[in-house]
Protein backbone atom coordinates (compact mmCIF):
# COMPACT_ATOMS: atom_id res chain seq x y z
CA UNK A 1 0.00 0.00 0.00
CA UNK A 2 1.43 3.35 -1.06
CA UNK A 3 0.42 6.39 0.98
CA UNK A 4 1.20 10.03 0.32
CA UNK A 5 2.86 12.04 3.10
CA UNK A 6 -0.47 13.78 3.76
CA UNK A 7 -2.27 10.43 4.10
CA UNK A 8 0.42 9.25 6.52
CA UNK A 9 -0.06 12.42 8.58
CA UNK A 10 -3.82 11.85 8.71
CA UNK A 11 -3.33 8.27 9.90
CA UNK A 12 -0.86 9.37 12.56
CA UNK A 13 -3.33 11.99 13.84
CA UNK A 14 -6.15 9.45 13.84
CA UNK A 15 -4.05 6.91 15.75
CA UNK A 16 -3.01 9.48 18.35
CA UNK A 17 -6.64 10.64 18.68
CA UNK A 18 -7.81 7.07 19.21
CA UNK A 19 -5.24 6.64 21.98
CA UNK A 20 -6.33 9.97 23.50
CA UNK A 21 -10.00 8.92 23.44
CA UNK A 22 -9.17 5.69 25.24
CA UNK A 23 -7.08 7.45 27.87
CA UNK A 24 -9.76 10.09 28.40
CA UNK A 25 -12.39 7.35 28.78
CA UNK A 26 -10.22 5.79 31.51
CA UNK A 27 -10.18 9.11 33.34
CA UNK A 28 -6.60 10.07 32.51
CA UNK A 29 -5.72 13.70 31.81
CA UNK A 30 -4.44 14.28 28.29
CA UNK A 31 -1.04 15.71 27.44
CA UNK A 32 -0.32 18.22 24.65
CA UNK A 33 -0.01 15.83 21.66
CA UNK A 34 -3.07 13.86 22.76
CA UNK A 35 -5.23 16.97 23.14
CA UNK A 36 -4.17 18.37 19.76
CA UNK A 37 -4.72 15.02 18.04
CA UNK A 38 -8.18 14.55 19.56
CA UNK A 39 -9.39 17.97 18.44
CA UNK A 40 -7.69 17.72 15.02
CA UNK A 41 -9.21 14.32 14.27
CA UNK A 42 -12.68 15.53 15.25
CA UNK A 43 -12.32 18.46 12.85
CA UNK A 44 -11.13 16.23 10.01
CA UNK A 45 -13.99 13.77 10.53
CA UNK A 46 -16.53 16.59 10.80
CA UNK A 47 -15.32 17.97 7.48
CA UNK A 48 -15.77 14.56 5.84
CA UNK A 49 -19.28 14.45 7.32
CA UNK A 50 -20.10 17.69 5.49
CA UNK A 51 -20.10 20.16 8.39
CA UNK A 52 -19.18 23.77 7.62
CA UNK A 53 -15.99 25.52 8.69
CA UNK A 54 -17.99 27.68 11.12
CA UNK A 55 -19.63 24.62 12.68
CA UNK A 56 -16.25 22.95 13.15
CA UNK A 57 -14.67 26.08 14.61
CA UNK A 58 -17.46 26.18 17.17
CA UNK A 59 -17.50 22.43 17.87
CA UNK A 60 -13.72 22.37 18.31
CA UNK A 61 -14.09 24.45 21.48
CA UNK A 62 -16.47 21.98 23.11
CA UNK A 63 -14.42 18.78 22.90
CA UNK A 64 -12.10 19.28 25.86
CA UNK A 65 -12.16 21.27 29.07
CA UNK A 66 -9.34 22.18 31.43
CA UNK A 67 -10.42 19.24 33.59
CA UNK A 68 -9.63 16.86 30.70
CA UNK A 69 -6.00 17.93 30.26
CA UNK A 70 -2.86 18.09 32.37
CA UNK A 71 -2.04 21.32 34.17
CA UNK A 72 -0.77 24.05 31.84
CA UNK A 73 -1.82 22.32 28.62
CA UNK A 74 -4.70 24.71 27.87
CA UNK A 75 -2.27 27.65 27.89
CA UNK A 76 0.10 25.80 25.56
CA UNK A 77 -2.57 25.53 22.86
CA UNK A 78 -3.80 29.04 21.94
CA UNK A 79 -5.22 27.75 18.66
CA UNK A 80 -5.28 24.69 16.43
CA UNK A 81 -5.18 24.84 12.64
CA UNK A 82 -6.21 21.84 10.58
CA UNK A 83 -6.32 21.52 6.80
CA UNK A 84 -9.42 19.39 6.38
CA UNK A 85 -10.96 17.80 3.30
CA UNK A 86 -14.52 18.97 2.71
CA UNK A 87 -16.86 17.74 -0.04
CA UNK A 88 -15.91 20.84 -2.06
CA UNK A 89 -12.16 20.72 -1.40
CA UNK A 90 -9.57 21.35 1.30
CA UNK A 91 -9.97 24.26 3.70
CA UNK A 92 -8.06 25.53 6.71
CA UNK A 93 -10.04 25.36 9.96
CA UNK A 94 -8.75 27.41 12.89
CA UNK A 95 -10.05 26.82 16.40
CA UNK A 96 -9.11 29.64 18.79
CA UNK A 97 -8.80 28.78 22.50
CA UNK A 98 -9.82 25.13 21.93
CA UNK A 99 -9.62 24.17 25.61
CA UNK A 100 -11.83 26.26 27.87
From Swiss-Prot:
<dbReference type="InterPro" id="IPR036463">
    <property type="entry name" value="Urease_gamma_sf"/>
</dbReference>
<dbReference type="Pfam" id="PF00547">
    <property type="entry name" value="Urease_gamma"/>
</dbReference>
<comment type="similarity">
    <text>Belongs to the urease gamma subunit family.</text>
</comment>
<dbReference type="InterPro" id="IPR050069">
    <property type="entry name" value="Urease_subunit"/>
</dbReference>
<dbReference type="InterPro" id="IPR002026">
    <property type="entry name" value="Urease_gamma/gamma-beta_su"/>
</dbReference>
<comment type="subunit">
    <text>Heterotrimer of UreA (gamma), UreB (beta) and UreC (alpha) subunits. Three heterotrimers associate to form the active enzyme.</text>
</comment>
<dbReference type="InterPro" id="IPR012010">
    <property type="entry name" value="Urease_gamma"/>
</dbReference>
<dbReference type="GO" id="GO:0005737">
    <property type="term" value="C:cytoplasm"/>
</dbReference>
<dbReference type="GO" id="GO:0043419">
    <property type="term" value="P:urea catabolic process"/>
</dbReference>
<comment type="pathway">
    <text>Nitrogen metabolism; urea degradation; CO(2) and NH(3) from urea (urease route): step 1/1.</text>
</comment>
<protein>
    <recommendedName>
        <fullName>Urease subunit gamma</fullName>
        <ecNumber>3.5.1.5</ecNumber>
    </recommendedName>
</protein>
<dbReference type="GO" id="GO:0016151">
    <property type="term" value="F:nickel cation binding"/>
</dbReference>
<dbReference type="GO" id="GO:0009039">
    <property type="term" value="F:urease activity"/>
</dbReference>
<keyword id="KW-0963">Cytoplasm</keyword>
<keyword id="KW-0378">Hydrolase</keyword>
Amino acid sequence: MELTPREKDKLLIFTAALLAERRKARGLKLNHPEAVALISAAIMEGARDGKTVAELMSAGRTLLSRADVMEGIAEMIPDIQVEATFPDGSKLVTVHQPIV
